[in-house]
Design a protein with these regions (language model features):
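Phosphate-binding loop of NTP-binding sites
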Residues: 3, 26-32, 49, 62-66, ...
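Structural beta-sheet core signal
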Residues: 36, 139, 179, 217, ...
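Beta-strand->loop->alpha-helix junctions that form or flank phosphate-binding loops
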Residues: 37-38, 56-59, 95-99, 140-141, ...
């Protein structure tokens, strides 16, 4: 922790990233002088600026602070970035986001949530249950909590709830007292190379659990027998072989009511207002953590009923008798499958139109068959051009690759502008927009096209 106390001034390269902005808010809350760079202004960077954090949007060495104690960068920043190169050449303390999380969590009780999907919702649910029940925690989230409109909060209690990101193996720097693993599906193969390497990293993550600690895993993970800790629970939506699972599910006006069952206890009539059957499973993971920590059942139930979700996770951008518009971060075949089946569990009579923006050329290429299979679950699909993020184009890897593998007939690749024209003309009753790129910037214009008819 001594490293942290020495920092009076800190600079973030890529401050607008979801994980980076949480760290920026953490240091700001400690009275540290925080500033940063990002390549574009977003609602999130504007929130940071409003809190007193100086941000510039040009890659210029003359704009960076020369008296900073530490420089934090994200893996999404290219190695040749002028500001990063400058700080390295001048021998400043230059660290990754994961190094800073390691410093923060060295002396705390840590609840670390990992998994190739589901982790943001589970992390946010756990942090919300702990905050709402009065247990208290410091939270570093990979999404914006709809309850608190932030991805970070602090507490006097020396407990940290943190999203453990497997990208570039950064989660292996954390030492959990409680670890949750939500999924181990192949992802980030640009880093790991093979699905087996992804699994190996998660097994290593489970081995980081402190002696006497607890490991909570989704039922049915591959190589589950290699995931071991002193206290261990599996969870599932409906697999009764799991240590904790749901039963007696009822859908009421887009909300879910269910019981949660363990061999030692049963929690009756849990009400969750967040859509998507996969979110019942995410909720069970969070409840399992809360029960392990000894939080009272009634406090857990009240907190779950008050959970408003995570921005861009099954988020209703518009919901009235004429139109439903759902915005979601899904960018992996399994997430898309869960999203579409979740929407259909609530709106089973309506035609589901999906607008999907693929994220990364490498992921599109590696998971093309899986994407096509999941996209085929929708009634009609519009695919936008691939969002490149940190990557250069790959030959033969375009949105048409997915289109050609799909079996349904109502499908097309459109530009963003063409998609807006299509929405204005067709006025779909049930529209889902999914992706991790910049598709979220289209949600408001699409909402207005639906509202103004």
């Amino acid at each position: 922790m001594s490293k942290l106390n020495e920092i009076k001034k800190i600079y973030f390269i890529g401050i607008g990233g979801i994980g980076m902005s949480a760290l920026a808010r953490y240091f700001k809350s400690r009275g540290v002088d925080v500033s940063g760079y990002d390549k574009t202004s977003t609602p999130l960077t504007r929130e940071l600026e409003a809190s007193g954090i100086a941000i510039h949007y040009e890659e210029r060495v003359d704009l960076v602070p020369k008296d900073t104690d530490a420089v934090v960068y994200t893996p999404a920043i290219p190695a040749q970035h002028a500001e990063l190169v400058y700080y390295r050449e001048q021998n400043y303390t230059v660290v990754k986001r994961s190094d800073v999380l390691q410093w923060i969590t060295e002396g705390s009780f840590n609840i670390c949530v990992g998994g190739t999907h589901g982790k943001t919702t589970v992390t946010t649910m756990i942090a919300h249950l702990l905050r709402h029940s009065g247990y208290g925690c410091n939270a570093f989230l990979g999404g914006i909590s709809a309850n608190y409109q932030t991805n970070f909060w602090s507490s006097e209690r020396n407990v940290v709830v943190v999203e453990a990101d497997e990208y570039d193996r950064s989660f292996l720097k954390l030492v959990p007292d409680v670890a949750v693993i939500t999924a181990m599906d192949p992802d980030h193969l640009d880093i790991y190379g093979t699905p087996e390497e992804v699994e190996k990293a998660f097994i290593e993550f489970s081995q980081k659990v402190k002696p006497g600690g607890c490991l909570i895993t989704k039922q049915g993970l591959s190589r589950a027998s290699e995931l071991k800790a002193e206290h261990q629970y599996s969870y599932s939506f409906e697999d009764t072989g799991a240590a904790v699972h749901a039963t007696n599910l009822k859908v009421q006006k887009g909300s879910y009511c269910f019981d949660v069952v363990n061999k030692d206890w049963i929690m009756k009539d849990v009400v969750l207002h967040m859509g998507g059957l996969h979110n019942i499973e995410n909720c069970i993971a969070a409840i399992t953590v809360a029960k392990y920590l000894g939080i009272e059942e009634e406090k857990i139930k009240v907190a779950v009923a008050d959970f408003k979700g995570v921005r861009r996770r099954f988020e209703y951008a518009l919901k009235n008798d004429q139109h439903v518009l759902i915005d979601d971060y899904a960018h992996h075949p399994e997430e898309l499958r869960a999203l579409i089946s979740g929407v259909k569990s609530i709106f089973n009579k309506d035609k589901l139109v999906l607008v999907f923006q693929p994220h990364l050329f490498s992921r599109t290429k590696d998971q093309a068959d899986g994407f096509a299979h999941s996209l085929d679950m929708a009634d009609e699909v519009i695919i936008l051009p691939i969002y490149p993020a940190r990557e250069l184009p790959m030959e033969g890897v375009t949105s048409e690759l997915l289109l050609n593998k799909m079996k349904i007939t109502n499908k097309q690749v459109l530009t963003k502008e063409e998609m807006k024209i299509w929405v204005a003309a067709h006025q779909p009753k049930l529209l889902v927009m999914a992706g991790a790129g910049d598709i979220d910037a289209l949600v408001q214009p699409v909402k207005e096209l639906l509202e103004n008819k």
